[in-house]
């Protein structure tokens, strides 16, 4: 245990002790008068709250002899704030103790950090073996090019950060991102998590809990899905315009998750709310009933698209195709035929309306009437629905040759070798020599 002290007393005492003989002794106790500032203000550097300690192990070695020292570092923070904490006002409420607490899932499995350490010790061989098998498959026994491996592994690491967590009832949840002390983008946002695939394919049982929340708890009687999952903390429903790509993407993810798990009961339980969500989509975003979306479509960009556009409409087509197949599995013949007809008509019409011979465009005659539209531009995200369709295993939702042409166009018009001559006042994800 380190000396508590003021200023850097703790580090100084540790360093003096350690550099003396390489061994760790009990902290030094001093009766010397400290800094008087502490009598006037609660300076953190004078009245420290944190407790610090060090662990050391030693052996006497002969010249050239080697010895391995293993340490098991575990932690146990059983409770978390029962609220989404993102903004300053949320953090201030937390500091005032206005929120309750809820247990983390691992608190239902272990009693303390020592219990966790014992589990690691007794299962070390299996845990190490499984971890190495995964690493070997990812890095050493694959034919994937390096840039694909880099993209995959860079995103997988998010799972072991504070970005996401699991609550005591088993529900998996997460932010859009994290800052150094709080989250950013709270609520397991469907139109953000829509594009993540890691959890679904590595831990499908966790991913399934997100679908249960989205449909069974956050989709109302009209079929409208909330854009943020506040129910996981028993907070009031988040009031905001629904996200077209998020809600329809969640429909696709239901089928993907069913295929990953083979859980028919999961599908049967969630199916009525899926039907409601699709009814809402057809009324809210397909205003003229031609199975091509043309209404006001809120998206993950935090803007709305107006009129037919390939980004949201490709997700809509993927949702229709998934629903056609799911309806057959659960024995809902009426909706099976409804979705089959809508998909067939919608796919043909969307391709006819939006494919310009090279890629898919937004169809909007009054393009200047609305801000932030891309019109005839080559949107890099134009085939997100096709991507989700592939992830759900339903193949092409648009003509294969047109999909190929559109993908080639995305690369042709959007790939840059550097950003020295690209002006942007928006969020900068790449500058100068980055690509």
Where are these regions (language model features)?
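The feature captures the catalytic groove of carbohydrate-active enzymes
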Residues: 2-20, 25-42, 53-57, 68-120, ...
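Long, low-complexity segments enriched in small/aliphatic residues
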Residues: 412-413
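Substrate-binding groove/exosite segments of carbohydrate-active enzymes
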Residues: 36-38, 44-58, 65, 69-76, ...
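Short, intrinsically disordered, charge-balanced linker/junction segments flanking boundaries
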Residues: 431-435
């Amino acid at each position: 245990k380190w000396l508590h002290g003021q200023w850097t007393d703790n580090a100084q005492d540790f360093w003096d002790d350690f550099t003396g003989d390489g061994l760790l002794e009990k902290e030094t106790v001093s009766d010397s008068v400290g800094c008087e500032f502490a009598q006037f203000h609660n300076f953190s550097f004078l009245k420290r709250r944190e407790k610090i300690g060090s662990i050391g192990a030693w052996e006497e070695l002969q010249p050239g002899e080697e010895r391995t020292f293993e340490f098991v570092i575990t932690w146990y923070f059983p409770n978390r704030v029962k609220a989404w904490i993102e903004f300053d006002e949320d953090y201030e409420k937390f500091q005032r103790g206005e929120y309750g607490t809820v247990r983390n899932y691992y608190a239902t499995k272990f009693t303390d950090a020592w219990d966790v350490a014992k589990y690691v010790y007794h299962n070390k061989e299996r845990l190490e073996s499984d971890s190495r098998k995964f690493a070997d498959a990812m890095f050493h026994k694959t034919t994937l090019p390096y840039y694909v491996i880099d993209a995959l592994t860079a995103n997988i690491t998010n799972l072991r950060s504070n970005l996401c967590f699991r609550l005591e009832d088993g529900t998996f949840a997460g932010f859009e991102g994290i800052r150094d002390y709080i989250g950013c983008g709270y609520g397991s946002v469907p139109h953000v998590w829509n594009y993540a695939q890691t959890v679904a394919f590595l831990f499908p049982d966790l991913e399934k809990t997100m679908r249960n929340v989205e449909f069974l708890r956050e989709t109302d009687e009209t079929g409208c899905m909330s854009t943020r999952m506040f129910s996981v903390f028993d907070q009031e429903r988040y009031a905001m315009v629904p996200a077209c790509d998020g809600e329809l993407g969640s429909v696709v993810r239901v089928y993907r998750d069913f295929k990953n798990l083979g859980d028919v009961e999961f599908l049967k339980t969630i199916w009525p709310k899926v039907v409601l969500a699709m009814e809402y989509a057809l009324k809210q975003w397909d205003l003229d009933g031609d199975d091509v979306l043309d209404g006001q479509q809120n998206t993950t960009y935090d803007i709305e698209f107006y009129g037919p556009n390939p980004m949201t409409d490709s997700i809509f087509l993927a949702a229709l195709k998934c629903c056609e197949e799911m309806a057959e599995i659960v024995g809902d013949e009426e909706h099976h035929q409804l979705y089959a007809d809508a998909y067939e008509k919608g796919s043909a019409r969307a391709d006819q309306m939006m494919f310009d011979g090279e890629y898919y465009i937004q169809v909007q005659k009054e393009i200047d009437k609305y801000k932030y539209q891309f019109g005839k531009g080559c949107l890099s995200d134009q085939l997100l629905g096709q991507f989700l369709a592939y992830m759900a295993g339903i193949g092409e939702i648009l003509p294969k040759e047109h999909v190929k042409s559109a993908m080639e166009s995305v690369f042709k018009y959007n790939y840059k070798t550097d950003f020295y001559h690209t002006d942007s006042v928006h969020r900068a994800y790449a500058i100068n020599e980055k690509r």
